[in-house]
Amino acid sequence: MERLVLTLCTLPLAVASAGCATTPARNLSCYQCFKVSSWTECPPTWCSPLDQVCISNEVVVSFKWSVRVLLSKRCAPRCPNDNMKFEWSPAPMVQGVITRRCCSWALCNRALTPQEGRWALRGGLLLQVGLSLLRALL
């Protein structure tokens, strides 16, 4: 008798739990924008059910004392390829960096921290210029 009462008491709980398991999960959310100059122009958006990752691309080109940044962020079904960072210097006093990141949790394609993004590039460039000037003066 005790078993019957225990079974009857736990049955509604099991049915309620089974109902929760069938509720659809929310889609991934990512920041989304295309070739903008500021992360504030990248609003968050819900991805389609097929999208599994967030992608972030940042192109930074430094010309002497100015910096040009282009950001693109979006949802995607998979990563196009691994995370990468490509640097090049097409001319003296011109430096470029392309950074691509792929991640799979909500709003993970945020803006880069100052250590990761354009300020690090500008700081590195200023340090190189400063050291060159110091060598020239000595």
UniProtKB/Swiss-Prot annotation:
What's in the keyword line of the UniProt record? Cell membrane, Disulfide bond, Glycoprotein, GPI-anchor, Lipoprotein, Membrane, Signal
Cellular compartment(s): Cell membrane
Task: List the propeptide residues.
Answer: 118-138
| Topology in membrane | Lipid-anchor; GPI-anchor
Q: Where is the lipid attached (GPI-anchor amidated glycine)?
A: 117
Q: What InterPro entries does the annotation carry?
A: LY6_UPA_recep-like, LY6H/LY6L_nAChR_modulators, Snake_toxin-like_sf
Can you name a GO cellular component term?
Answer: side of membrane
Q: Specify the signal sequence span.
A: 1-16
Which residues pair up as cystines?
A: 30-47, 103-108
Q: What name has this protein been given in UniProt?
A: Lymphocyte antigen 6L
Q: Which organism is it from?
A: Homo sapiens
